[in-house]
Amino acid sequence: MEVGLSPSACLRRIKLMEQAGVIRGYTALVDPTQSESTIAVIINITLERQTEEYLDKFEAAVRKHPEIRECYLMTGGSDYMLRVDVENAGAFERIHKEVLSTLPGVLRIHSSFSIRNVLAGRLKAKR
């Protein structure tokens, strides 16, 4: 793909976007067939209450656990959706016992193991 800029001008624009916060970070999409295999576990969390106090405490606790890779406040049947990556069921059991079940205000935890990744890291479509 051509952008009509010299490499140095392109790098300068990237640096400016990083400094302005337009580019917040970078992600490596690792092919699980080329690395140690991990399993994505999607976890739906229902809180006892959905008050600002409960939401704030839950979110603060989630941020303290690097095992939790993603966390979304949701509409629908669950309050939050989390993602963790584990090597096996035993590793997930540890996270369930030591992390998920200790999060404040949790009423229900529902976990689903992915079978395989169908689509990840898609860039925003051009319009």
Curated annotation (Swiss-Prot):
GO biological process: response to amino acid
Keywords for this protein: DNA-binding, Plasmid, Transcription, Transcription regulation
Pfam families listed in its UniProt record: AsnC_trans_reg, HTH_24
Record-linked InterPro entries: AsnC-type_HTH_dom, Dimeric_a/b-barrel, Tscrpt_reg_AsnC-like, Tscrpt_reg_AsnC/Lrp_C, WH-like_DNA-bd_sf, WH_DNA-bd_sf
Single Gene Ontology MF annotation: sequence-specific DNA binding
Residue ranges crossing the lipid bilayer per the database entry: none
One annotated Gene Ontology cellular component of this protein: cytosol
Annotated HTH asnC-type domain residues: 1-46
Entry superkingdom: Bacteria
Protein function: Not known, symbiotically active.
Protein name stated in the entry: Uncharacterized HTH-type transcriptional regulator y4sM
